[in-house]
Each structure stands twice: as structure tokens, then as C-alpha cells.
Amino acid sequence: MFDLLLRRARLVDDTLTDIAIQDGKIAALGEISAPSRKTIELNGKVYVSAGWIDSHVHCYPNSPIYHDEPDSVGIATGVTTVIDAGSTGADDVDDFYQLTRKAATEVYALLNISRVGLIAQNELANMANIDAAAVKQAVQRHPDFIVGLKARMSSSVVGENGITPLARAKAIQQENDDLPLMVHIGNNPPNLDEIADLLSSGDIITHCYNGKPNRILNPAGELRSSITRALQRGVRLDVGHGTASFSFEVARRAIALGILPHTISSDIYCRNRIDGPVRSLALVMSKFLAIGMTLPQVIDCVTVSAAEGLRLSRKGRLEVGFDADLTLFRLEHRPTLLVDAEKESLQADNILVPLAAIRAGKGYLTEQGSAEHACVSSHRYCNCLRTLKEGLPDVDAAYR
């Protein structure tokens, strides 16, 4: 007998399937007749994908500048896995690890190459903060938690050190089994061409569609040749929207040139979650639908491609044996004015609305799902939401 059965779930290709869960894993797909302790009848009204993965968040609660709670940026918004992108370094990653053990959301970390992490904006201005031995020891202490490294390569961070911190980061990467390296780009120096030329296959450029002068497009609106070469080597592009790092103009132009992101991520923390312009991963994903990406393309960027980029081998796919991490959502026709980090706006016809998440077989209504469950009975989705609330095992409101 299965623990949970989702019947007639709609996939992003609009096919319908049953999904069975047992012992925290996906146990069966297709037309399923076997019994289950709990059954949720979705009747094709709700999309189900592999659990959404946000490849770039800041959720170390004790960070003095970029902080949030893992479940506030994760399970409450339909995101089952988050990767904190460099909030902690070797000095405070142990504390972060312990705090994440209490979260419903699966949390991983990209370790800041600065041992002090993000205690200030200029963590790489002092080269003494880059301690290769401390990084190696931290990775050895937390091999299943630290899934990569993070280096922020913009002028306010590196000070007078230019490209040198990135050269050190690449050496540290080689000493740690070539863990994925995420590199933040922003204002120069260092120049983006210098940064891109140092990167190799599997490295990740985050804030790839930022609107700053040091962007991936040249003044003529064409892709920089250094980025073309980097992509040919297997370097990956991550959105990392954030407060100041996403431009509709740059994203539209790049995507028109065929330069799509490998991963869509939020760079969310408490301030840009509450005050915008980020709000949630779902809203960032909706911006890419508005720009012209298809629903399957967008979902791939937060599931299979995100898992592959960070070597999360048990996540990102709706396949038997994978973790039972699922996001239940709908694509709603709701004209919405979306805003980027440059304060430019774009009218969207449709937005993604996460209703519930299942993490390792445990179910949670999202904040939006909970709010809509309190709808009037005439609402066309009310019966479905009631079914979700009644059917999900161990629905937990602890993240609120």
C-alpha cells in the first residue's frame, strides 16, 4: 500500500498521470490501481512537477545583511529545495547547518570562499579572508550540505583585489573535487571578460541578466564574445534576480538571441521578499513566461537543470526512485504588472500560483494555497484546495 497517491495530476506537457509516493520516494507513475493510505483527486486541474529548486537564495537567519528563514523562502512558496549562495563561510557554516536541521525545506549551501561569509559587503577586499585550508575543512565536515562554492566578483566586494579572488577560488575548487563554483557578476572592476575567461565547465554565472554596464551584452546589444566562449566550454547561466540584478531589457534581448538561462533563481532574502521586486521564485518564473519562455522551459530551469547543475542526483525529476519532492501549482490567467530590478515594468497575462508542496513525502500547503483555501465556496478551485488540505499528510503550518 502506498503512503500517498495523487490521481490525474497534470504535467507541464498537459498529459495526465497518477503519482504514488512511498517512504519519501516516488514509487510509481502512470495509471495506478493499487491502494493508498491517502488519495488526492486532482482531476487534471492542478499541475504537478518535480519539486522546485531555488539555486540562489540567502536564508541564513543570523546573517547581518542578507538573511531570512529557509521555510519562508522555501516550502511556504512551493519551493522544496533551496541553495544558500554564500551567506556563510568556513567560520559560520556549522551554525547554519545546525539551524537548517529544523527546516521543512531541504537546504544546501554554496560556501563563500571568504571564511567570514556575508558579514559585510566587501568580504573579498581582504585576501586574508580567503583561507583554502578553512574551506577544505568545512567541506570535509559537511560533504552532504556544502554542494559548491561562491565568489562574489564585483567592485564593492573585491575592493582593490581585482580578479585575484576568482583565481584563488578556482584553485580552491580544484582542491575540493571540482565542486560547482557560482560567480556573482556586477559592477566592474573586474571586467566581465576577465571573469568569464577564468571559468570552466560547470561553473555558474549568476545575475546573468543584470542591467549594469558590466553585463553579458555589449553596447551593440550582442552577446560578448567572452560569454560565447564560456558557454561553449560548458559554463552555466543563472538568473539570480535579486534587488538589483535583473533587467527585462537584457533578458528579452539575450533570450531573443537564444541565450536562455540554465537555472531560474530568485536571490531572495527577507527585504526583497517582503518589499519586492523578487517576492518569490514563482513570481520570478512568471517573469520568464511573460518574456516568452514556455512553461516546460521554465519548469526545467527549477527542476532537472537546477538539480544537474548542483549535482543533486536524487532531485529534479518525476521518476521512480527519486525523492518525493513535488510542487503542485496552477497557471492562472491573472493580468499582473511585473517589475524588474531596474524599475521597468512588464504586463503579464498569466502567473504561476504554487498551491502545495510535498517534501520527502510530507505535504504542506503554501501560503497562497492556504489563503485560497479560505475562499468563498463558489470559487472554482475551492473544492480542489479543500481536497489538497484534507489529503496531504502531516500538513504543517510551522513556517508561518
Model-predicted regions and their roles:
Residues 9, 24, 45, 56, ...:
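Divalent metal-coordination and catalytic microenvironments
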Residues 14-21:
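A conserved glycine-rich beta-strand in the N-terminal activation segment of trypsin-fold
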Residues 50, 75-80, 111-128, 194-212, ...:
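Active-site gating loops and adjacent loop-to-helix segments of metal-dependent hydrolytic enzymes
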Residues 72-154:
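Divalent-metal coordination cores built from histidine and acidic residues
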Residues 151-254, 258-275:
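Active-site core of metal-dependent hydrolases
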Residues 249-331:
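His/Asp/Glu-enriched, well-ordered alpha-helical/loop segment
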Residues 323-377:
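C-terminal cap of metal-dependent C-N hydrolases
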